[in-house]
Amino acid sequence: MNIEKSTMLSTALANFDRVCSLLGDEYSPDLLQKLRYPKERSELRLSPQFSDGRIHTIHAFIVHHSDAIGPCKGGIRMSPTVTLDDVTALAMEMTWKCALIGVPFGGGKSGIVADPLTLSPDDKQTLIRSFTRNARRNIHPLVYVPAPDMGTNERDMGYIKDTISYSLGYATTQGSYVTGKPVIMGGIPGRREATGRGVVLSTMEALSTLGGSIKGARVIVQGFGNVGAGAAETFAEMGAKVIGVSDVDEAIYDEKGLNVVALLEHVRKTGSLRGAGQGRVVSHDAILEMPCDVLAPCATADQITVKNAAKIQAKIIAEGANGPTSTEADAILAQRGLYVIPDILCNAGGVFVSYLEYTQETQQEQMTREEVLARLDKRMKDKFKLVHDTATTRKLHTREAAMYLAVRNVCAAHIARGALP
């Protein structure tokens, strides 16, 4: 298979190729080569009829990267710029993330080429239901279990669950076809904030490891969507000083600290950080280069590049987004001695709580928010320690250590299944 390399995919492949050199003596080249490519890539042509009366043609993609450990798991991204290669990279990253955090899932991802900001609520529902009908053979509790991602939310997951359940003649809350749903439909309390909270928990461990504390730590959060806003809120609750935030419209900075609660309320009312009335407005490039203890890129891929890696003044990079650091920039950060919490560890809180949702729905139980967060806290701390100790023992950078552990787990699953001799 000849995969055209996008920036996101080239970064994912470079991270994988780097760890293959560490695993070459443990596993066969054929097995490692197998993991370099997805199991299945599907392109869909959706034909929803929107409220304007027209039938629109919209492209969508589904990628199943690996199901060696369990059914594929990964969100549905809705964006006018998402590509098949992007979805392939994200599915591959989900394989490593699930293997590292220790949940019985493989990696998958979906992409819908549409701008959610230009769709009315009714048209978005129509599009999501059209996607579900066309993707029906791909979505199943034992095949691929979607979740929210950029441009989609828990309401959309409810539409997916309802569409499938209705077609099967099941009650809406029967069958774990999707996670990240509304709690009333079988979702789990704590899922919405799980990814952002995981970012903060791993950062707390990193600060402690380096002899610091979350109390008073100066934090900049890039991105103010579900992950970034959740992380900023939790950072503030834990005693950190959030001195900078940004979204697609505006970046603001105040070395004395921002009122995160007020920012969240402003965004809830207006949908944007613009006009928040706090701090001073800076450029989106500048916010990444301001002095701080922790920089949490929680927006999109390739935000830390060769152009700014040498200018970043943070001590810790907490990768709340998927693939926010390019391969070349990663080498610069490592050379400078910055502590990077890699994305497959840092933002794994979401898929861990999705696993809890999957299991509780299968068993027809209901966990409390306190139970969910307690289990999340322990898992993030345990896996951070494992990655840090592996990096120290094997003299690896943290990303290499995380990838080493993840890929080794997937290889072990393949061998246990007898997929290859």
Please state what every model-predicted region is:
Residues 2-7, 206-207, 310-421:
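Adenosine-phosphate binding glycine-rich loop
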Residues 250-340:
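Rossmann-like adenosine-cofactor binding region
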Residues 181-182, 186-289:
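Glycine-rich phosphate/diphosphate-binding loop of Rossmann-like nucleotide-binding domains
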Residues 26-32, 102, 140-148, 172-174, ...:
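Flexible, glycine/charged-enriched surface loops at secondary-structure junctions
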Residues 2-45:
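Short, Gly/Pro- and small/polar-rich lid/capping loops
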Residues 44-116:
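Glycine-rich, N-terminal phosphate-binding loop and its surrounding beta-alpha-beta segment
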